[in-house]
């Protein structure tokens, strides 16, 4: 199994560390030539979504990655990655990939100083959830499965091959969300 990690900005190093601990081969995606045919999945890390969107366009990564996601490549977006995947952004910003049928509210939990950690349920397991200038989903399509909520706000979802979390599982010791993503990849490879 080989997973590409978008490595333009944000918490990509932490995602790579998690993948290594799980024994998963990975490649940093920094430019178009880094995209290879033998990728089984993609991670879009947290960071600053506007800067990431700009770099995706400038480096000619947006369209090929969007096509891969549309063709069924499993993708996992955290925080800014959730915003990049969202079909709609409630503050009027243009969507980036626009492949995940949700509406997100950017910086919904306030500024950097308002960042926090909590424990909440991801599916049937309580896990630590670090929120850093995090979004949440205000609306989800009926085809979207809600995987986690915090204070009645939707903070993790799945739609087909797409997984998104408003929090940063890469900043904890828990592997639950990564194991869920790897399971998603394995099930897809059996199809």
Question: What is each residue range found by the language model?
Answer:
Residues 1-58, 63-68, 175-179, 183-191:
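N-terminal beta1-alpha1 cap of cysteine-dependent amidohydrolase-like domains
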Residues 43-44, 77, 165:
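Redox-cofactor binding/interface segments in oxidoreductases and associated redox assembly factors
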Residues 26-27, 75, 162:
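Hydrophobic anchor at the start of a short beta-strand
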Residues 35-38, 70, 140, 158:
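Flexible, charged surface loops at secondary-structure boundaries
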Residues 49-120:
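Cysteine-nucleophile active-site neighborhood
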Residues 106-191:
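Amide-donor transfer/coupling interface in amidating biosynthetic enzymes
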Residues 8, 78-80, 100, 133, ...:
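A secondary-structure boundary/capping signal
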